[in-house]
From Swiss-Prot:
Protein's job: Contacts the emerging nascent chain on the ribosome.
Species this chain originates from: Methanothermobacter marburgensis (strain ATCC BAA-927 / DSM 2133 / JCM 14651 / NBRC 100331 / OCM 82 / Marburg) (Methanobacterium thermoautotrophicum)
Name of the protein: Nascent polypeptide-associated complex protein
NAC-A/B domain segment(s): 9-77
Key word Protein transport present: yes
HAMAP family tied to this protein: NAC_arch
Gene assigned in the entry: nac
Gene Ontology CC terms, in alphabetical order: nascent polypeptide-associated complex
Length: 117
């Protein structure tokens, strides 16, 4: 249920009954190996999380607890020199502009060329 509440089992049962009467239902989601939250420029990865699902009047809310690790997506993109040269030749831009466009598009050659043309 809700970790760290410091309730004895009787209080917990009473709270669960009260939640049920208000139309709230809370369950553990079992077997979750990983939760990934994708943002524009990074990902938050939670391995072996504890996930609770609360259903209140048809609206589901997920509570995720665990140790999170952040990955910067921009830092992970490795752009080959051949790709940079191709974008430079196709668009006539500088090496820095071609590299920036490729990083912004995640290494997508066609998208980088279209953005610079």
């Amino acid at each position: 249920m809700i970790p760290g509440m410091g309730m004895n089992p009787k209080q917990l049962k009473q709270m669960q009954r009260a939640m049920k009467q208000m139309g709230m239902d809370m369950k553990d989601l079992r077997g979750v190996e990983e939760v990934v939250i994708k943002l524009k420029k990074k990902e938050i990865i939670i391995k072996n999380p504890r996930v609770n699902v609360m259903d209140f009047m048809g609206q589901k809310t997920y509570q995720v607890t665990g140790k999170a690790r952040e990955c910067d997506l921009e830092a992970e993109v490795k752009i080959p020199d051949d790709d940079i040269e191709l974008v430079m030749n196709q668009t006539g831009v500088s090496r820095e502009e071609a590299t920036r466009a490729l990083q912004e598009t995640g290494g997508d050659l066609a998208e980088a060329i279209m953005r610079l043309s």
